[in-house]
A protein has these predicted regions:
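A donor-sugar binding/catalytic signature common to diverse glycosyltransferases
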Residues: 20-22, 315-362
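Conserved nucleotide-sugar donor-interacting segment of glycosyltransferase catalytic cores
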Residues: 89-164, 218-220
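C-terminal amphipathic helix plus adjacent low-complexity
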Residues: 107, 380-432
Length: 432
C-alpha cells in the first residue's frame, strides 16, 4: 500500500487538519508519517503515527512570526506584512529540503503532502525529487480564479462592474507589492537547478498534481473556473480532543433552559483579549449561558474583570463536546473553529483579527451563516447587539444548517484520503 508523508507546522489548527487526514488514510490501509516540530512528537506517538521531527527548521523562529507582538500579521501595514509573509513562507525552504530529502530516501513515501504554508514540497521537491505533491488550503482556495477577488484584503466577490474593476485594480497592485516574494522564490528554485517562477506562488500551487481545498465551493464564492488539479474535499477538522486535555463533564452543570453562546479567540491569539472581554462584559446577566475559552491562556490571566453568574470561563473545552449544544459561536475566524461550528449548524459572529481570518469572515457573511464585527468595533455594546441579532434572526441558523448539509455531502477527511490515494496510484502507474 502507498505511503504518505504529511508536513505541518505545530499550530493547533494545522495539526487537527493533518491528523484527521492521516487517520482517514490509515483507515484505508495506508502507512502515514508526519514531519513537524519536535514538541508535537508525543501527540503523534499517541495517535500511532510514524514521526519525523524538524531538524534544521527553526521552530522558535516560526513561533516568533506567529506570536511575537512586534510582527505584522495582517495587511494593515502592507509592506511589513509582505516581509512577514516572505519570512513565513520562504526563508525556511532550504532547511525544509535539507530535512525532508533524507526522509524521502530512507522512508520512501509515495506522496508528499504539504500544509499549504510549508511550501518547500511544492516549490522545490515536487520537481527536484520527482515525487507527487499535494498541497492543502484549509478554507479559502488560494489558486486565483475568476469568481474570487485577489486574496488578502477580504474584498467582495467580483459580481458587478464595480467589484470587478476593484478586483482587477487590486490584483495589479498586489503583483507589484509581492514582486519581492516572487523574486525570492525564484532565487531559491534556481539554487536547486529549477527554472524561475513565471507566475505568483499561489497560481503556481495550482499546477501541482493535487491542490486540496478543505472546504466546499459553496463557502468559497462557488468557484468553478479553477484548474482541474484543484479539488474541494469538505472540512477535515473535527478531531480536536487530545487525551491530555481535561474532560468536559462540567458542561452538564450548565443550565439548558437558555441559549448557549461560546466565545473563543483560538489557540494562536496573543494580542489583547478583545473578544473575550467584550463578551464577558456585554453578555453579562443576559438570558443566555456564555462559555468563554482562553485557548492556551488561563482566563484568570486575561483581566476579564468580575464575571457574572451566566459567564463560564475556562482555558479549553473540546469542540466535539461543546459545539452541538450551542446557539451562537463568537470567534476570531480561525478555519478549524469556523468549519467545526458550521458542520453542526451553529451560526457565527466573527471578529477577524489577522492572517486569513478577514477572508474567512467575508465568506461566512456572504453565505448568510453569520456576521462580521470589525475588531475596532468589538465593544461590549456592539457584541451584545450582534449576539441578539443572530439569536433572533432565524435565517442565520437556517443558513448554517444548510451549510452543514452541504459539508456532509463532501465527505471531508474520507474524500481527501481517497483523492490522495488516487494520486499515489496514478503516479505508480506512470512509473510502471
Amino acid at each position: 500500500m502507498p505511503r504518505f508523508l504529511l508536513t505541518c507546522w505545530s499550530f493547533t489548527g494545522h495539526l487537527f487538519h493533518g491528523i484527521n487526514i492521516g487517520r482517514a488514510l490509515r483507515e484505508r490501509g495506508h502507512e502515514v508519517a508526519f514531519y513537524s516540530a519536535p514538541k508535537t512528537a508525543s501527540l503523534f506517538a499517541e495517535e500511532g503515527f510514524t514521526f519525523f521531527p524538524f531538524e534544521k527548521v527553526d521552530e522558535e523562529a516560526m513561533s516568533d512570526i506567529m506570536f511575537a507582538p512586534n510582527r505584522e500579521r495582517s495587511v494593515r501595514d502592507t509592506l511589513q506584512f509582505t516581509r512577514t509573509l516572505q519570512t513565513y513562507l520562504l526563508d525556511t525552504i532550504p532547511q525544509q529540503v535539507e530535512d525532508l530529502a533524507p526522509i524521502l530516501a530512507d522512508w520512501k513515501p509515495d506522496v508528499l503532502v504539504d500544509d499549504g504554508t510549508i511550501v518547500g514540497p511544492f516549490l522545490v521537491m515536487w520537481e527536484k525529487y520527482n515525487i507527487p505533491v499535494a498541497t492543502l488550503d484549509y478554507f479559502c482556495c488560494l489558486v486565483p480564479g475568476p469568481e474570487a477577488p485577489p486574496f488578502g484584503l477580504a474584498l467582495p466577490p467580483p459580481r458587478n462592474w464595480h467589484t470587478r474593476l476593484l478586483a482587477r485594480s487590486v490584483a495589479m497592485g498586489t503583483r507589484l507589492v509581492t514582486a519581492s516574494i516572487r523574486r525570492r522564490a525564484s532565487e531559491i528554485r534556481r539554487s536547486y537547478g529549477l527554472p524561475p517562477l513565471t507566475t505568483s506562488i499561489n497560481e503556481f500551487s495550482g499546477r501541482v498534481p493535487l491542490h486540496l481545498v478543505l472546504n466546499t465551493p459553496e463557502l468559497d464564492y462557488n468557484q468553478r473556473g479553477l484548474p482541474a488539479t484543484v479539488r474541494y474535499a469538505g472540512p477535515c477538522c473535527l478531531w480536536n480532543r487530545p487525551s491530555y486535555e481535561q474532560s468536559a463533564d462540567w458542561l452538564q452543570q450548565v443550565p439548558r433552559d437558555k441559549p448557549w453562546v461560546h466565545a473563543t479567540e483560538g489557540t494562536a491569539h496573543v494580542s489583547a483579549p478583545i473578544v473575550l472581554r467584550a463578551a464577558a462584559q456585554g453578555l453579562a446577566n443576559l438570558p443566555m449561558e456564555v462559555i468563554l475559552t482562553g485557548g492556551k491562556r488561563e482566563p484568570s490571566a486575561l483581566d476579564l474583570g468580575p464575571l457574572a453568574a451566566n459567564i463560564h470561563a475556562v482555558r479549553w473545552v473540546s469542540h466535539v463536546d461543546l459545539l452541538p449544544l450551542l446557539d451562537v459561536m463568537i470567534t476570531t475566524g480561525g478555519a478549524a473553529n469556523v468549519k467545526s461550528a458550521l458542520a453542526v449548524g451553529v451560526p457565527l459572529i466573527i471578529v477577524p483579527t489577522e492572517w486569513d481570518k478577514p477572508e474567512i469572515a467575508r465568506r461566512v457573511e456572504e453565505s448568510g451563516a453569520g456576521l462580521r464585527l470589525a475588531p475596532r468595533h468589538c465593544t461590549p455594546r456592539r457584541m451584545r447587539e450582534a449576539v441578539e441579532r443572530v439569536l433572533h434572526t432565524p435565517s442565520y441558523r437556517q443558513n448554517a444548517q444548510r451549510i452543514a448539509g452541504i459539508f456532509a455531502k463532501y465527505g471531508g477527511s474520507a474524500t481527501a484520503a481517497k483523492l490522495l490515494e488516487e494520486l499515489a496510484l496514478k503516479h505508480a502507474t506512470v512509473i510502471s
